[in-house]
Amino acid sequence: MTGAPDGAAVRAVAAVDLGATSGRVMIGRIGPQTLELELVSRFPNGPVETPEGLRWDFDALFENVVRGLAKAVRREPSIESIGIDAWAVDYGLLHDGVLLAPPFHYRDGRTSRGVEEVHARVPFSDLYARNGLQFLPFNTLYQYRADARTSDADTALLIPDLIAYLLTGVRAAERTNASTTGLLDVHTREWDIDLAHALGIPSGMLPAIVDPGTVLGTLTPGMAARIGADLPVIAVGSHDTASAVVAVPMTSPDAAYISCGTWGLVGVEIAEPVLSDATREANFTHELGVDGGIRFLHNVTGLWLLSETVRAWEAEDGAKIDLPALLEAASAVDGPVPVFDANDPSLSAPGEMPTRIADVLRAQGHAVPDGRAAFARSIIESIAAAFAGAIRSAAELSGRPIRTIHLVGGGSLNRVLCQATADRSGVPVLAGPVEATALGNVLVQARTLGAVPSTLEELRALVSRTHSPERYTPRP
């Protein structure tokens, strides 16, 4: 694919970017020296309690996606395509094209049963040798094992693939997101049918795999009428982190990245898997990147801890909290604050976060900070300490020095977190772009359309030319 010549017209695409707490539809505008985003629609996303467990309000989510796309087309009639990225691991089950039930939320408690049943059949060490995936209790293969309705399904689609199907009628599994399921062979990068059979997971429901940049299909007539244009849907790096890493302006192999939102995904890019006892014990994962590289990374709890704490305080106060003011007060806290294990399993569920963090602090021998500013600072320093530990592990396990950390996503706006990460890692942090995920989504679409150059290095060079990161130097 060739890039647009100098002086070429700016092109436009629509990016659907879905996170665990909110979703957005954005217009991306791309040219030789242009890479811009315009927010068209933002809407909440989250779990709902049902008699069957914790599920996503998927009908509302999809309706908001369609409305957002229609609004984008009205605002920018020259939009040429649609790309969709979302969080990993969760899925919908179809039978004869109909969604059997709203998708389960990855924090639903049924996953613990799935873990026990999977590991009883295939030990984790054997799983890791086949899929290279870190242990997370909500990985898709554990969810499939715990889901009684897989036997009724003819197709299982991860969230971005499910939305693409509802828009186009085309069923496919985008490869970067498929690599997070635990059912993709880390060597062949295809479905591990033997593993699925060993786990009692119906392999017939696993759809054909496509690579990022594939044109999945055009909108169905009904969707084209609702959205207002007959557009193709292009498979991007549909795992949001895969899209984010496309837009990390790394220029050398000694750079690491942190994609920070609800989660912090900390890692480096490598060409071949590192399937050692050390990487397994460090819980490092191998997820596929947009152009076939491996995102060698570790999941760290991110801003979830702070956002859940603020949510609890707002419920207690009956009023919104001024987050910038809270962060300013946190940055002004004088003296050390206690640092706790941000990845403590007791902090993974929603609700009562300040109480549960206080319990973790006491259990780890710390006094609970006095006042909300100090409490928030303790949370931020604990997240930064977890980031720094993961950076050190990435360097040791990959065998390469880390001289720069690129921190992208919503966390790049948190100056306290960026500085604390630099301080605790001893490595300079370059913060931004904040919208790396949507930018990566847009870039892959644009490349398929022939609007930008074809290599990952050239795509990142465009990010560098159009977005200036903020540098945080480690303090002694």
Predicted regions mapped to residue ranges:
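Active-site phosphate-binding/coordination module
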Residues: 70-139
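Enzymes and membrane/adaptor proteins characterized by extended Gly/Ser/Thr/Asp/Glu-rich
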Residues: 169-178
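Conserved phosphate-binding loops in N-terminal lobes of ATP-dependent enzymes
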Residues: 24, 66-81, 137-145, 151-164
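Short glycine-rich phosphate-binding loop at a beta-alpha junction
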Residues: 78-86, 155-156, 208, 397-409
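Active-site core segments that coordinate phosphate-bearing ligands/cofactors
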Residues: 2-3, 14-15, 119-131, 142-158, ...
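N-terminal glycine/serine-rich phosphate-binding loop of ATP-dependent small-molecule kinases
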Residues: 1-101, 224-234, 425-427
